[in-house]
Amino acid sequence: MVTILDTINPDAKRVRHPEKAHRPDTEVMRKPDWIRVKAPTSKGYAETRAIVKEHKLVTVCEEAGCPNIGECWDKKHATFMIMGEICTRACAFCNVATGKPNALDMDEPENVAKAVREMGLSHVVITSVDRDDLEDGGAEHFEKVIWAIRSASPATTIEILTPDFLKKPGALERVVAAKPDVFNHNMETVAGNYLTVRPGARYFHSIRLLQRVKELDPTMFTKSGIMVGLGEERNEVLQLMDDLRTADVDFLTIGQYLQPTRKHHKVESFVTPEEFKSYETVAYSKGFLMVASSPLTRSSHHAGDDFARLRAAREKKLLMAAE
């Protein structure tokens, strides 16, 4: 997965997390063996890195030290982050910079579409920072990016990973009307953690957003992801699964939270691979079409391959229902 920011700020680098500067340092737990990966050295990785540098793009994968960077870049998987690199929220888990965002780049939709075509992407994920400063939360910009990709690379399937559009009436409806193939909105964590982990969001607003997508377009695939290791209890994770199934969400991803810096929320535990497998089994039993659950699972990890499996799972379900 290549997470690509849309611009390079030529100005002096801002303090990345000013809102966290006052927080005491927290202990960073040593990663267990099952989290560690080899350094990226493949030809495909080098080629992807060259493409990124050629287009003068910045990647969160590099800055955040994503554990999947070698695997994803080797396969030229890409996730574009639109609407700038500065977020209006300050979630305790996230390494994206917080502050006052810059104005939208009106050329960005076409530039993203050109990159998708030049990289030959069969599946692309479009995500963004939160833009609470915009009247529509960036919905129109999402719409324009989707349209531009459809025009430049018609065969590419499009997955969007959106913010929650909190207090932005009509924003969700506009994005759904643009017809992405997959609508992803991450719950991030269980309800009991929202005040400390995701204070700018509302748990049941996010559940309702995912439910509303299905009401607007029952054929659209919906997806959500969470992190574990933030102090949640198992029963809270199972309740979250039930809430997502009530919203008819198709695809659930579960991955291990990794602490970006000492100023971020600490890792409370490293969940074992066996526990991840158990979560996967339970999630399938609750009716999800697709489940990805492992320590290194990330929301856009294997997104293209998973989309193909997701479509196949739906077709199988429809055939079984027709018998």
UniProtKB/Swiss-Prot annotation:
GO terms for cellular component: cytoplasm. Residues 73-289 form the Radical SAM core domain. It is found in: Cytoplasm. It catalyses: [[Fe-S] cluster scaffold protein carrying a second [4Fe-4S](2+) cluster] + N(6)-octanoyl-L-lysyl-[protein] + 2 oxidized [2Fe-2S]-[ferredoxin] + 2 S-adenosyl-L-methionine + 4 H(+) = [[Fe-S] cluster scaffold protein] + N(6)-[(R)-dihydrolipoyl]-L-lysyl-[protein] + 4 Fe(3+) + 2 hydrogen sulfide + 2 5'-deoxyadenosine + 2 L-methionine + 2 reduced [2Fe-2S]-[ferredoxin]. Keywords: 4Fe-4S, Cytoplasm, Iron, Iron-sulfur, Metal-binding, S-adenosyl-L-methionine, Transferase. Pfam families: LIAS_N, Radical_SAM. It is an enzyme of class 2 (transferase). Signal peptide: none annotated. Its EC number is 2.8.1.8. [4Fe-4S] cluster 2 binds at C87, C91, C94. Its cofactor is [4Fe-4S] cluster. [4Fe-4S] cluster 1 binds at C61, C66, C72, S300. Binds 2 [4Fe-4S] clusters per subunit. One cluster is coordinated with 3 cysteines and an exchangeable S-adenosyl-L-methionine. InterPro entries: Aldolase_TIM (IPR013785), Elp3/MiaA/NifB-like_rSAM (IPR006638), LIAS_N (IPR031691), Lipoyl_synth (IPR003698), rSAM (IPR007197). Pathway: Protein modification; protein lipoylation via endogenous pathway; protein N(6)-(lipoyl)lysine from octanoyl-[acyl-carrier-protein]: step 2/2. Its main location: cytoplasm. GO terms for molecular function: 4 iron, 4 sulfur cluster binding; lipoate synthase activity; metal ion binding. The keyword Iron applies. CDD domains: Radical_SAM (cd01335). Belongs to the radical SAM superfamily. Lipoyl synthase family. This is Lipoyl synthase.
